[in-house]
């Protein structure tokens, strides 16, 4: 027994193994190890004033994401897939820009692991998309995916998942269409709708029913703002969306989209 305990302590004290980042950028595919990225000629030590995931200032060794996206243009669409099934849909343009907000791929050093995101939770590593000056370009929390395993170039959400589209007869400036854009930015990374989407974390938001059908309006708003105030369990992962992230008019538009899609179930 004593030998088993000693072995367990030894294993727990060993550094994390090097991770692999997979890039699938159309005709170009590439794998980067964490060691290669930490030694990348453009790697820098950066400071994040208010980290979205850790809720405090953080310091990282990071590479400008744009230098890794060989062959990607501003009109392309990318998806960052996390180890837990989170799938962030992102237009490429903000990821390629060098300011005012700039995207960085933070790389966890296996010899100096980052802190856990919470009790019983892993860290944000091995790879984490962070931003300097995010407020300058309106970068939202869902654009900070962590535990990234793969970044890939795909067709747009509209082209891949027509079941998500609102009625084409709606005017271009309708609240429902604006709500669809907000759904893509804030919800699609965790939820599918009408079975459409790549996320594997949260429930489908229209099949078999829309939350607009089984929640009273005030409770649905409360769920979106502060999920833990309505229901709690140890594995809960849904974040709350404060007004600084999703304004009241934007929440109205998001709910307008969900109500509209309740009538467009397959």
Placement of each model-derived feature along the sequence:
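The canonical Cys-X-X-Cys-His
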Residues: 179-194, 220, 238, 254-258
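Axial heme c-ligation environment in periplasmic c-type cytochrome domains
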Residues: 200-206, 226-255, 261, 265-266
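Structured, non-membrane catalytic/scaffold regions adjacent to prosthetic-group chemistry
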Residues: 19-155, 266
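N-terminal signal peptide c-region/cleavage motif recognized by signal peptidases
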Residues: 13-15
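Second-shell loop/turn segments in exported
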Residues: 49-56, 168-169, 208-210
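Gly/Gly-Pro-rich "capping" loops immediately C-terminal to redox-active cysteine motifs
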Residues: 192-225
